[in-house]
Swiss-Prot record:
Keywords assigned: Ribonucleoprotein, Ribosomal protein, RNA-binding, rRNA-binding
NCBIfam families reported in the protein's UniProt record: rpsS_bact (TIGR01050)
Function statement: Protein S19 forms a complex with S13 that binds strongly to the 16S ribosomal RNA.
UniProt cross-references to Gene3D superfamilies, sorted A to Z: 30s Ribosomal Protein S19, Chain A
GO CC annotations, alphabetized: cytoplasm; small ribosomal subunit
Family annotation (PROSITE patterns): RIBOSOMAL_S19
InterPro entries: Ribosomal_uS19, Ribosomal_uS19_bac-type, Ribosomal_uS19_CS, Ribosomal_uS19_SF
Entry annotated with the keyword RNA-binding: yes
Pfam families the UniProt entry points to: Ribosomal_S19 (PF00203)
Keyword Membrane: no
Species for this entry: Anaplasma phagocytophilum (strain HZ)
Gene name in the database record: rpsS
Protein name, as recorded: Small ribosomal subunit protein uS19
A Gene Ontology biological process term: ribosomal small subunit assembly
Amino acid sequence: MSRSVKKPPFCAPHVLRLANRVIASNRTSVVINIHSRSSVILNKFVGLTFGVYNGKTYVPVKVTDNIVGRKFGEFSPTRRFLGHAGDKKVSRKG
């Protein structure tokens, strides 16, 4: 089910607070480290760089016009695919 049209997009309050602080100081080159993968990327974040935590490291996400409206977690994968298991060769004796 999609989100109700009446509700605004969800963005964690601490993410908004950190972004507003960086915007007010005009230091757009600083990386804002966040854990909130479920927060929606807003228009005011364009030009900022966020470090989205994937459980191990902070993955840098540069916000552009193309990714506004999507969630931070989409750009920080939590699992690494190592490939499917190969066929095990059965060794026969004798």
